[in-house]
């Protein structure tokens, strides 16, 4: 009877989780459309869109920072950002396994084997809850997080929308990707020199794009096939921690309104972004960072521009993500405790 009840509960939870994943994923796509509307249909958006972006801040390998002369309109620049995010979503959608098959076989232990668009709503909502909880805990102890402000809400939205692209390219794609790739090349078996050089270059490029694909090619353990404990090497854990720490520290040291409490929350987010990069590839950390900046930013901007229903939409997406994240945390803890109790019960 207890086994049947447990299976029934698991089936109900699976349906609820699948519904929440679909609702959250739908809200992601709605935010993409909303961003276009706010920039190209709202008067404040059109006014900002006519301005010029003279130069573009860029960064690689965390420490190499420079500016690229641009000279395009804000409207054109936002469209380029939007298309890059659309491309990232397309890569996630067409990646294997498919979104539909992952949704049908949705179970908590297999989350890292799922399509990223099934994993993202779960991970992002849990991370959102963790960041909110950590920030509240710190501020209750007098450690402030701070925040950044902009003279124009539209230009502020443009700035935070661009940040995931440049920051993920700098901290995850080039730093983790190149260091991890060089580590794999160093460990490769000896081959004839010309072939070895060609293989090394291809392997490095593949590792930057999709670290798991490179590891599969070399016959190494992967997260998807072998789990987290075996699928991430000690070297990768080390690089992941170091880049996450640097990501957190830079947010505070760069100023702009952030206070010391930002270090821990940014480090936590950076760790999650680095992790999904190792599992899914270059598009994954961009979309997780997009969730915090563009996704919430669109609904917040809609509220600031007094769009009809903007206040409610902004509240609703925060409530939905907090609720989903809390439910997942509680369910995960409950499943773990039930498993622990069951194993002890069988032993006795």
Which residues does each PLM region occupy?
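N-terminal, membrane-interfacial amphipathic/helix-forming hydrophobic leader that caps
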Residues: 1-117, 132, 136-140, 297-348
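Alpha-helical transmembrane segments and their membrane-interface junctions
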Residues: 126-146, 241-258
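Alpha-helical transmembrane spans of integral membrane proteins, capturing the lipid-embedded, hydrophobic core
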Residues: 20, 24-28, 78-86, 116-128, ...
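Transmembrane helix-loop-helix hairpins at the membrane interface
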Residues: 153-347
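Juxtamembrane loop-helix boundary motifs flanking transmembrane segments in multi-pass membrane proteins
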Residues: 5-8, 108, 149-157, 161
